[in-house]
Amino acid sequence: MTSTNDIRRSFLDHFAKEGHELVPSAPLVPHNDPTLMFVNAGMVPFKNVFTGLEKRPYSTATSSQKCVRAGGKHNDLDNVGYTARHHTFFEMLGNFSFGDYFKERAISLAWSLITGTWGIPADRLTVTVFHTDDEAFDLWKKIGMPDSRIIRIPTSDNFWSMGDTGPCGPCSEIFYDHGAHIPGGPPGSPDEDGDRFVEIWNLVFMQYEQVDKETRIDLPRPSIDTGMGLERIAAVLQGVHDNYDTDTFKALIAASGELTRTATNGDFKASHRVIADHLRASGFLVADGVLPANEGRGYVLRRIMRRAMRHAHLLGAAEPLMHRLVPSLVAEMGAAYPELVRAQPLIEETLKLEETRFRQTLANGLRLLDEATGAMKPGDVLPGAVAFKLYDTFGFPYDLTEDALRAQDLGVDRSGFDAAMAEQKAAARAAWKGSGEKASDEVWFDIAEEFGGTEFTGYVSEEGDGQLLAIVKDGQRVAEAKAGDEVVLVTNQTPFYGESGGQMGDAGRITGDDGLEIAVEDTAKPLGRVHAHRGTVVSGSVRTGDALHLVVDGDRRTRIRANHSATHLLHAALRNRLGSHVTQKGSLVAADRFRFDFSHPKALTPEDIAAIEAEVNRHIRENDEVTTRLMTPDAAIEAGAMALFGEKYGDEVRVLSMGKAGRDLGAKSYSVELCGGTHVSALGDIALFKIISESAVSSGVRRIEALTGEAARQWLTQRDEKLKEAAAALKTAPDDVPARIAVLVEERRKLERELAEAKKALALGGGSKAEAAGPEDVAGVKFLPQVVDGLDPKGLRGLVDDAKASLGSGVSVIVAVNDGRASVAAGVTADLVDRISAVDLVKAAVAALGGQGGGGRPDMAQGGGPDGDKAADAVAAVRDALAKVPA
C-alpha cells in the first residue's frame, strides 16, 4: 500500500522534475487576503501572483497546501464525520503556471502522473470540460480519452473566477470511477451526487480577465491553477472508497479507539471520525498561531474543538482526551510539517485546557438538552430559547447543539435562537454606561453587533492585511473618507493593539490602493472588543469593504513592549524587597516612560530604590525567555500568577512568565502575571531599567515612574552632563562633587549660625523702635515687651525663651519687623499657664498687625501680620489683653 506521505512526496517530485519550484505550504492564516478567514485552496498563497501584484523568481510551482474549510461559505463542519469525504482540514496538492505553459502541457502533466507514475487505469477515469471549451475537449481526445468519457458541463461548476472581476477561465475536472457496486452516476447525470464517481483533480485554465459584468477579455499570458485533494487521491491509491479508511485517518482513529476502549465502527463510527478530523484541524491551527477565542478565527477553532470534545464525551472519555492524541498526529504528519513538532507542547496544552474547561459545563448542558428533548419525537424542533441558553450559559455553539440532536432526528429553531441573541444584545446596550455620549455609544454598539469583535493578530506580527468594515467620522458612520478627514476605522483583523490593561494603543499607518495612506495616531477598544484605529487620511480615499494593509509603528511598539515587561519585573522586585502586601494598583505603559502604582504605606528609602533597580537590571542581563500560556483565570492564580488591578478576565487568560527565581535547573519563574498586553520575547530586549521618581498617590498607594532602554540611557547621559557642569562650577572633578558640596553646605550652616547669633545679639542690645527698660507690672504680672528689626521668625523663639528665663515668672512678647511685615512671639512661664495663654496674647497682637490667626501652645505661640508699622500697637494690644486676665 502507498502511504499518504509517499503520495504527497511523489506528487511534488513529479512536478519538481518537470521544472516546477517546490513551494512549502503557507500558514493557514492568509497574509495577503483579509477577506478569507483561512486558506481554503492551494492557489490562495499565489493569488497576487496570478493578478500581477506580486512577482516571484519562478514561473511554475508545485505545493501541498494546508487548508481549512470551517467558516463562511466554505463550511464543511456540519457534514464532517457523517460522509466519506468531508473534512475541516485537508491538503490540496497543486501545480501552477504563471504565464508559462497552458492547457496542453497541464493536461499532459496530469495524465502522466495519474496513469504513469501512479498507474491508475485510464478506463477508470472520466473528465469534464466547460461546454464551450473545444480546445480542452480536443486535447483530451488527443491524449487518448474516448468521447464517451469527455463530458461537456454547461454550469458554473466548470468555470472558475476569482471574484466579480479579475482572472477567470474554464475548468476541466478528472473523476475516478469506484465501480458499479457504489451508487451514483457520472458527472452531469441525474444521480451525479452519488459516491461512485469522485472528483480527484481540477485543472483551471485562467485565460480571461473579467473587466466588468458584461466584459470579458483574453489574458495576454494565460495561467494554470490545479487542485487535488490529497485525502481523496490517497483513498484511490490505497484501494478504499472512504477517506477515513486511509492510513493517516486509520492511525488517528485507532488511537482514539484504544484510549477510550471503544469500537471504531458501529455506533461510535461517526464520533471517532469527527475526533480524527478535528484533531488535525485543531493541531494545525494552533501550530499556525490560532488560539481558542470568542471572536474570529479563534472562535471557529473553539467550535471545532468543542465539537470533537462532545464526541469524546459520547465515547465515555472520563478525562480530557484530545491532547493525548497529539503524539499520534505528530507521528503521522510531523515529518511533512515540522511546525507540528515544534508546536506539539503548545497544541497539547491548548487542547487540554480547552477540554478541561469545557467538560465542566458540558455535562450540565447535556443534562439540560436531555430534559428539553425528553418528550420530543423525531422531526420535532428544539425551541431557540433553549439553544440560546446552551450557548450563553454552557458555551455550546449553535452548530454543536444541532450536531448533538442530529442522531435523534431533531431540529433547532434558528430564528428563535437569533431572537434570543438579539434580545440579550438589546439588554446589554440598555445597560451600557459608555462615554455618556449616546450617539457615539450607539455607533459602536451597531458596529459590534454587525461585525463582532476585531481579531487581534499583533502578538505574532506588526503588520498584516485587513478588510475595512466601518468608517466613523464625527461620531457617525460614513461610507467613504477622503484626504484630510479625521476618522476612526474598524477592520476585521488588525495587528494594532487597542489601549487596555494600562498599555497605550498602537500608532502606525494604513495603506491601500491608489495611493491611500492613513496616519494612525492611536488605537482604542470601544466595548472592549472592537479595535478602533483613530487617524487622518493623508492621501487618497477609502471606502468600506476596501482591502487595507496595516503597519504598526515598530519602534514605538518595541519601546512599549520593553516598558510593559519592565512593569512585571518591577512588580516582582517590589514584592521581594518590601513584602507580599505589595499589589499593583494601576499603571500607564507608554512608549517614552511608564508609571506603576502599588500598595505600600510609606516612602521607599534610597536603599530600597537602589536594591529594586539592581534586581530588575540583573534579570534583564540574564536575558531569560518570556513565555506565554493560555489558562483559566482560576488555574492561573492557583499557579501563582498575579492579576492586574481593575482588570476583568474572561474564561481564558494569557499568562506571562519571565525570569528565574534562581539559576538552578528547574527554578520557578521570577514573575508570573495575567496579562493581555504585548511583551518582549527575551528580557535582554529591555536593555536597561531606571527609576526616576517615587511619590505618594494617595493614602497607602505609592507611584514609581521609570524608563527603559534608550530613554533610560539618555536620562543617565543628561544626568552625567549636569554633574560635569556642576563640577566645573565648583572647580572640582565630577567624582569629588559630593565631598565639595558637603564642605560648602557645612560652611553655609556655620555662617548662618554666626549670622543668627549676631542678629540675636543686636536684638538683645536694643532695637530702633523700642527698647526694653525692664519688665512692666500689668495686673500683678511681670510683662517684658520688645520690638526688633531684621530678625526672621525662626529667631524669635530663642529670644522669648531667654526672656522667660530672665523673668522667672511673667510674660514676654517680641515683635520683629522685616521688609514691612511683622512677626510676633509670646511666651508665658510655667507658673502662669493655668491663667494666661500665649495663644490668646498672640492672636491679639496679630489682629493689631492686620493679620489673622496665630497659634501654638499655652506657654509659647507665634503669628504674624502684613503691617510692620503697627508693631507698637501689637505690644499695646497684648498689654491690654493681659490687663483683662482675671487675678
Curated annotation (Swiss-Prot):
SUPFAM superfamilies: Class II aaRS and biotin synthetases, Putative anticodon-binding domain of alanyl-tRNA synthetase (AlaRS), ThrRS/AlaRS common domain, Translation proteins
Biased composition (Gly residues): 851-866
Entry EC number(s): 6.1.1.7
Primary enzyme class: ligase
Reaction equations catalysed: tRNA(Ala) + L-alanine + ATP = L-alanyl-tRNA(Ala) + AMP + diphosphate
Chain positions recorded as Zn(2+) binding sites: H564, H568, C675, H679
Region (Disordered): 851-871
Predominant subcellular localization, coarse grouping: cytoplasm
GO molecular function terms noted in the UniProt entry: alanine-tRNA ligase activity; aminoacyl-tRNA deacylase activity; ATP binding; tRNA binding; zinc ion binding
Record GO biological process: alanyl-tRNA aminoacylation; negative regulation of DNA-templated transcription
UniProt family annotation: Belongs to the class-II aminoacyl-tRNA synthetase family.
UniProt comment concerning the protein's domains: Consists of three domains; the N-terminal catalytic domain, the editing domain and the C-terminal C-Ala domain. The editing domain removes incorrectly charged amino acids, while the C-Ala domain, along with tRNA(Ala), serves as a bridge to cooperatively bring together the editing and aminoacylation centers thus stimulating deacylation of misacylated tRNAs.
Purpose of the protein: Catalyzes the attachment of alanine to tRNA(Ala) in a two-step reaction: alanine is first activated by ATP to form Ala-AMP and then transferred to the acceptor end of tRNA(Ala). Also edits incorrectly charged Ser-tRNA(Ala) and Gly-tRNA(Ala) via its editing domain.
HAMAP family associated with the record: Ala_tRNA_synth_B
Protein name as catalogued: Alanine--tRNA ligase
Source organism per UniProt: Rhizorhabdus wittichii (strain DSM 6014 / CCUG 31198 / JCM 15750 / NBRC 105917 / EY 4224 / RW1)
Designated gene of the protein: alaS
